[in-house]
Every structure is written in structure tokens, then in C-alpha cells.
């Protein structure tokens, strides 16, 4: 297992616009959805296909299709929903889990307030989404919870990651692949990724 940085030019271009402090809430939200489409392509690159019989205008054939119902997108609330929307546009048959966590600004530790997931997650691929992998505490807590429910096939998708968060996360869950658009320099004293883009949830919902 490892860490994949999605360096596609479109991803990097859109990420740069999102980083700019003058980017509006509406533009930030739109760009996050657009990037999620591109990141989803990468994280689902090796999904298994099955075949189904169809008829084209010319003849019958057995055609490849994705078994979308075997896929779960797990959003770490609230910012994860910004990535979730675009991914569901691509895979509308996927199931959805919501994991409510917020970071205590004094201890930087995650506090859980909500968890809802499909009951039959044991045999499904679960892609956990959260724009930021900063300290890593929230991502670790979310995946701890999913594993408690029996999940064994999990991937983590984020927009930005800090080296400290990646180290902590991969030590806690070495079996979970990480996909990100950028690994930034470091965390500051408040646990924010720098240079980063600020608080993704606040910028997405205009609550900063």
C-alpha cells in the first residue's frame, strides 16, 4: 500500500485557483466538485468490471459494466461532502456512508458526533473522502470505525495532505492506500496545512 499524488495538469491548475484567498465560496465549491471528478477517476482506476448482455443498434453483445453497488463512498463531515457530490455524479449506484467528526481546536483530536453506513460493508470497497489530511487524527478515527464494522478494503482520498498526517496515517493503517492532489510543506502550530488553502469546510460553505 502507498501514497499516490495525482499530478494531472487539470487537477493542479484547479487546485491553484482553490488555494487563492480571493477565490469566492461559489468558485471554491465548484472547483472542489470538478477536482473530485478527476480524483475519482484515479482512485477507481483498477475497479473490477463484469459483463452484461446488451443490444446495440447493430447487434447483441456482452459489454463491460461497473458493479457500482459494491462501492461505498464514505464522507467525513462536513467538508467531505464537497468531494462526495462529484463522485456520486460519476458512480450514482454507489452506496454512501457519513462519518461526523470535528477537530477539537485545543487538543487537535477528533470528536465523533455521527456515524451512518450501509450494513453490508464487509465485502465492499470503501473510499473515504475528506479534503484535508492534516494531523491525520480524523482520517484514522474514521477508518477505525469502519474497520470495527468489518470493512477490510478501504482507500482514502483527499485534496491536500501534510507529511505529518501521512506519516501518522500510514503507521496506523498501512493497508489503506492514500490518494491526494498535493503533499504540502508541513503543519503550522494550529494544525493547519501550509501553504494549504485554509479551512476547506469554511471556504466551501462560506462560514469563515
Swiss-Prot record:
InterPro entries: PRibTrfase_dom (IPR000836), PRTase-like (IPR029057), Upp_B (IPR034332), UPRTase/APRTase (IPR050054), Ura_phspho_trans (IPR005765). One of its GO terms (molecular function) is magnesium ion binding. This is Uracil phosphoribosyltransferase. Keywords: Allosteric enzyme, Glycosyltransferase, GTP-binding, Magnesium, Nucleotide-binding, Transferase. One of its GO terms (biological process) is UMP salvage. It comes from Brucella anthropi (strain ATCC 49188 / DSM 6882 / CCUG 24695 / JCM 21032 / LMG 3331 / NBRC 15819 / NCTC 12168 / Alc 37) (Ochrobactrum anthropi). Belongs to the UPRTase family. Gene3D superfamilies: 3.40.50.2020. Pathway: Pyrimidine metabolism; UMP biosynthesis via salvage pathway; UMP from uracil: step 1/1. HAMAP family: Upp_B (MF_01218_B). Binds 1 Mg(2+) ion per subunit. The magnesium is bound as Mg-PRPP. It catalyses: UMP + diphosphate = 5-phospho-alpha-D-ribose 1-diphosphate + uracil. Pfam families: UPRTase. Uracil binds at residues 193, 198-200. Allosterically activated by GTP. The keyword Ribosomal protein does not apply. It is an enzyme of class 2 (transferase). CDD domains: PRTases_typeI. Its cofactor is Mg(2+). Catalyzes the conversion of uracil and 5-phospho-alpha-D-ribose 1-diphosphate (PRPP) to UMP and diphosphate. The keyword Ribosomal protein does not apply. Its EC number is 2.4.2.9. 5-phospho-alpha-D-ribose 1-diphosphate binds at residues 78, 103, 130-138, 199.
Amino acid at each position: 500500500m502507498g501514497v499516490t499524488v495525482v499530478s494531472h495538469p487539470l487537477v493542479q491548475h484547479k487546485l491553484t485557483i482553490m488555494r487563492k484567498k480571493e477565490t469566492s465560496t461559489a468558485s471554491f465549491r465548484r472547483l472542489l466538485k470538478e477536482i473530485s471528478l478527476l480524483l475519482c477517476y484515479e482512485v477507481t482506476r483498477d475497479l473490477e468490471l463484469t459483463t452484461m448482455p446488451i443490444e446495440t443498434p447493430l447487434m447483441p453483445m456482452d459489454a463491460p459494466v461497473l458493479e457500482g453497488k459494491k462501492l461505498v463512498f464514505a464522507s467525513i463531515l462536513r467538508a467531505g461532502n464537497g468531494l462526495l457530490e462529484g463522485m456520486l455524479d460519476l458512480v450514482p449506484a454507489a452506496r454512501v456512508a457519513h462519518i461526523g467528526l470535528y477537530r477539537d481546536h485545543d487538543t487537535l483530536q477528533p470528536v465523533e458526533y455521527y456515524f451512518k453506513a450501509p450494513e453490508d460493508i464487509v465485502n465492499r470497497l470503501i473510499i473515504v473522502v475528506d479534503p484535508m489530511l492534516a494531523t491525520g487524527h480524523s482520517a484514522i478515527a474514521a477508518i477505525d470505525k469502519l474497520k470495527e464494522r468489518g470493512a477490510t478494503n478501504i482507500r482514502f482520498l483527499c485534496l491536500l495532505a501534510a507529511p505529518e498526517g501521512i506519516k501518522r496515517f500510514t503507521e496506523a493503517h498501512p493497508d489503506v492506500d492514500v490518494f491526494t492532489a498535493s503533499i504540502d510543506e508541513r503543519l503550522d502550530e494550529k494544525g493547519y496545512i501550509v501553504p494549504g488553502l485554509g479551512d476547506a469546510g469554511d471556504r466551501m460553505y462560506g462560514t469563515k
